[in-house]
Amino acid sequence: MKEQKWIHEGLITESLPNGMFRVRLDNEDLILGYVSGKIRRSFIRILPGDRVKIEVSRYDSSRGRIIYRLRNKDSND
């Protein structure tokens, strides 16, 4: 049986080495996020200030996997 994960939205606050990021969730928690393989293969750039969807395990809520970069409402791309 596959493990259930929580999906949150948050804001990238800091970029760390090796594809790791500090993410502030909408509920004000600060967790460590790493880039999923699909985002890494697609060469999607994630920068501080971006909004992302992050998948958090029920067993370790201090780390999560970034699964989607949300589009900014004010950008024109």
From Swiss-Prot:
Q: So which residues are the signal peptide here? A: none
Keywords associated with the record: Chloroplast, Initiation factor, Plastid, Protein biosynthesis, RNA-binding, rRNA-binding
Q: Which domain of life is it from?
A: Eukaryota
Q: What is its main location?
A: plastid
For this record, the Gene Ontology CC terms, alphabetical, are: chloroplast; cytosol
The residue ranges of the S1-like domain are 1-71
Q: What compartments host this protein? A: Plastid, Chloroplast
Pfam families (alphabetical): eIF-1a
Question: Its Gene Ontology molecular function terms?
Answer: ribosome binding; rRNA binding; translation initiation factor activity
- PANTHER family linked: TRANSLATION INITIATION FACTOR IF-1, CHLOROPLASTIC
Q: Which protein family is named in the record? A: Belongs to the IF-1 family.
Quaternary structure and partners: Component of the 30S ribosomal translation pre-initiation complex which assembles on the 30S ribosome in the order IF-2 and IF-3, IF-1 and N-formylmethionyl-tRNA(fMet); mRNA recruitment can occur at any time during PIC assembly.
Q: What does this protein do?
A: One of the essential components for the initiation of protein synthesis. Stabilizes the binding of IF-2 and IF-3 on the 30S subunit to which N-formylmethionyl-tRNA(fMet) subsequently binds. Helps modulate mRNA selection, yielding the 30S pre-initiation complex (PIC). Upon addition of the 50S ribosomal subunit IF-1, IF-2 and IF-3 are released leaving the mature 70S translation initiation complex.
Q: What is this protein called?
A: Translation initiation factor IF-1, chloroplastic
Q: Which organism is it from?
A: Buxus microphylla (Littleleaf boxwood)
